Curated annotation (Swiss-Prot):
Protein name (database record): Protein Syd
Record family assignment: Belongs to the Syd family.
Subcellular location as annotated: Cell inner membrane
GO cellular component term of the entry, any: cytoplasmic side of plasma membrane
Pfam families: Syd
Major localization class: membrane
Membrane topology qualifier: Peripheral membrane protein
Keyword list, A-Z: Cell inner membrane, Cell membrane, Membrane
Organism: Enterobacter sp. (strain 638)
Job of this protein: Interacts with the SecY protein in vivo. May bind preferentially to an uncomplexed state of SecY, thus functioning either as a chelating agent for excess SecY in the cell or as a regulatory factor that negatively controls the translocase function.
């Protein structure tokens, strides 16, 4: 496990939860995750849940992605998806506002790996360098991803070669993220 990335993700999650506590006096809330089972759920309300991050309970790898694609995934990506269970978190990096994707439960972890595989299959078909997404943007054509060749965090326009480097590593990227509520 990439400890630097795991620590950076844990620190950002703490900043996010602290900001939520300051603004609302509660743990983070979600309407989108209402009715979706997770070890993160503290309380279920009328149309939303309160959640807090929980330790990841499965093997801490995305080996299914590696096996399916016959590649070695950057250690930082393993750490990103297997450090914790948590809800997706809104964040800002420089001028980009995004939804930082997280694994909500054991079932969600399987779905995330399937989506990563689908993303990599499309890239392979288009002869693009492999990336693994970590966040979504308002534009459905752009994502924040980790380049699997060098570990850089990039803003990528899906299906194209358009990629802008945002940070030299996932840990650096996470350490610069600001919570958005």
């Amino acid at each position: 496990m990439d400890i630097e990335t795991a620590n950076a993700l844990t620190a950002f999650t703490a900043r996010y939860c602290d900001a939520w506590h300051e603004m609302n006096g509660t743990w983070p809330q979600s309407e989108e995750l209402y009715g979706v089972p997770s070890p993160c759920i503290i309380t279920t309300m009328d149309d939303k849940i309160l959640w807090q991050p929980q330790p990841f309970s499965l093997e801490q790898t995305v080996n299914a992605v590696e096996r399916a694609m016959d590649i070695v995934v950057q250690p930082a990506v393993h750490a990103f998806y297997t450090t914790q269970f948590a809800g997706d978190m809104q964040a800002r990096f420089a001028n980009e506002t995004m939804t930082l994707l997280q694994t909500w439960s054991e079932n969600d972890f399987q779905r995330v790996q399937e989506n990563l595989i689908g993303h990599l299959v499309t890239q392979k078909r288009l002869k693009l360098a492999p990336t693994l997404f970590i966040a979504t943007l308002d534009s459905e054509l752009d994502v924040i991803a980790v380049c699997n060749l060098n570990g850089e965090v990039i803003k990528e326009t899906l299906g194209t070669r358009k990629r802008d480097v945002l940070a030299p590593s996932l840990a650096d990227f996470l350490n610069q993220l600001e919570p958005v509520l």
